[in-house]
Curated annotation (Swiss-Prot):
Protein name: Histone H4 variant TH091
Family membership noted in the UniProt record: Belongs to the histone H4 family.
Single Gene Ontology BP annotation: nucleosome assembly
Gene Ontology molecular function: any one: DNA binding
Chain positions found as N6-acetyllysine: K6, K9, K13, K17, K21
Keywords attached to this entry: Acetylation, Chromosome, DNA-binding, Nucleosome core, Nucleus
Family matches, as SMART domains: H4
Quaternary structure (record): The nucleosome is a histone octamer containing two molecules each of H2A, H2B, H3 and H4 assembled in one H3-H4 heterotetramer and two H2A-H2B heterodimers. The octamer wraps approximately 147 bp of DNA.
Cellular component GO terms held in the UniProt record: nucleosome; nucleus
Keyword set includes DNA-binding: yes
DNA-binding region boundaries: 17-21
Region of interest (Disordered), residue spans: 1-20
Length: 103
């Protein structure tokens, strides 16, 4: 560990708080053309207008589940940074094995 213990790495020592943009309604960032491109990749020819909101809802739930599991792995390892392997293991736990990111 090069002489440092696991506890403090210079984080959380106070100081000026940075202004962070409040994140709300980010799911609208998944645009209609982006959803259309994903559908095209899946072989879809025509898309109903009601699909876009439904797709955003399903994607939001899926990502919440994956991120929750990935953060659980991170916290168990006592880290503050979510790694690619945390996400790979979270996906594997849900039965969606992902290749190409190590492990």
């Amino acid at each position: 560990m090069s002489g440092r213990d696991k506890g403090g790495k210079g984080l959380g020592k106070g100081g000026a708080k940075r202004h962070r943009k409040v994140l709300r309604d980010n799911i609208q960032g998944i645009t209609k053309p982006a959803i259309r491109r994903l559908a095209r990749r899946g072989g879809v020819k025509r898309i109903s207008g009601l699909i876009y909101e439904e797709t955003r809802g399903v994607l939001k739930i899926f990502l919440e589940n994956v991120i929750r599991d990935a953060v659980t792995y991170t916290e168990h390892a006592r880290r503050k940074t979510v790694t690619a392997m945390d996400v790979v293991y979270a996906l594997k736990r849900q039965g969606r094995t992902l290749y190409g990111f190590g492990g």
